[in-house]
């Protein structure tokens, strides 16, 4: 099984993440940020990834450090779980609609961190959650998972729907990228021979 556990402790946050890439979509989430729990549940369910996240952070200030550090720690756990990437598809993509909203996410397990985040949320907050933190979560993930990630919200008039389509599409793109390629026979999916 491809799984990992990472603990990350700083003066601002204490994060513990367990990930199983060959899971059934089970999530146990206690981030202290309810909207982030809801979004991570989408990643687990649609990515068929078992995901456990517990976090304590300086939420008396705001959720920035907690959300960003969860992204960082998830990226670290993902890197450990995915291993050498031999025999994997490497690339994943997904379009996900939710009513009027539509988002596209494309990922490359390239070994090179890079992100394009093209999302104009229709409002600045979803309940108490600052939508700016969504890009911070993904940036933390990208920089520590060493992946290239393109996120595009193509339509939407409801910020919750915009966010949910992004996280669902991210889960589905991850699932595709980490699947075994039956024709690859365990080879590294790169002409360089390494990722």
UniProtKB/Swiss-Prot annotation:
EC number: 4.2.1.19
Cellular localization per UniProt: Cytoplasm
GO BP, sorted A to Z: L-histidine biosynthetic process
Keyword Lyase (UniProt): yes
Predominant subcellular localization, coarse grouping: cytoplasm
Record's catalysed reaction(s): D-erythro-1-(imidazol-4-yl)glycerol 3-phosphate = 3-(imidazol-4-yl)-2-oxopropyl phosphate + H2O
Metabolic or biological pathway: Amino-acid biosynthesis; L-histidine biosynthesis; L-histidine from 5-phospho-alpha-D-ribose 1-diphosphate: step 6/9
GO MF annotation terms: imidazoleglycerol-phosphate dehydratase activity
Any GO CC annotation of this UniProt entry: cytoplasm
Keywords associated with the record: Amino-acid biosynthesis, Cytoplasm, Histidine biosynthesis, Lyase
Highest taxon above the source species: Bacteria
Family classification: Belongs to the imidazoleglycerol-phosphate dehydratase family.
Protein known as: Imidazoleglycerol-phosphate dehydratase
């Amino acid at each position: 099984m491809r799984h990992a556990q990472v603990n990350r402790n700083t003066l601002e946050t204490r994060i513990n993440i367990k990930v199983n890439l060959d899971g059934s979509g089970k999530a146990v989430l206690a981030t202290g940020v309810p909207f982030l729990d809801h979004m991570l549940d989408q990643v687990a369910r649609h990515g068929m990834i078992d995901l456990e996240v517990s976090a304590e952070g300086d939420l008396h200030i705001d959720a920035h450090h907690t959300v960003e550090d969860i992204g960082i720690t998830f990226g670290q756990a993902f890197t450990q779980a995915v291993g050498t990437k031999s025999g994997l598809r490497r690339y994943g993509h997904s379009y996900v609609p939710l009513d009027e909203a539509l988002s596209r996410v494309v990922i490359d397990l390239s070994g090179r961190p890079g992100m394009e985040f093209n999302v104009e949320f229709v409002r600045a907050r979803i309940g108490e959650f600052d939508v700016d933190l969504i890009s911070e979560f993904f940036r933390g993930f990208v920089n520590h998972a060493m992946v290239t990630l393109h996120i595009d919200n193509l339509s939407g008039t409801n910020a919750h729907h915009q966010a949910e389509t992004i996280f669902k599409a991210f889960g589905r793109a991850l699932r595709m990228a980490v699947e075994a390629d039956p024709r690859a026979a365990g080879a590294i999916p790169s002409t360089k021979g390494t990722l």
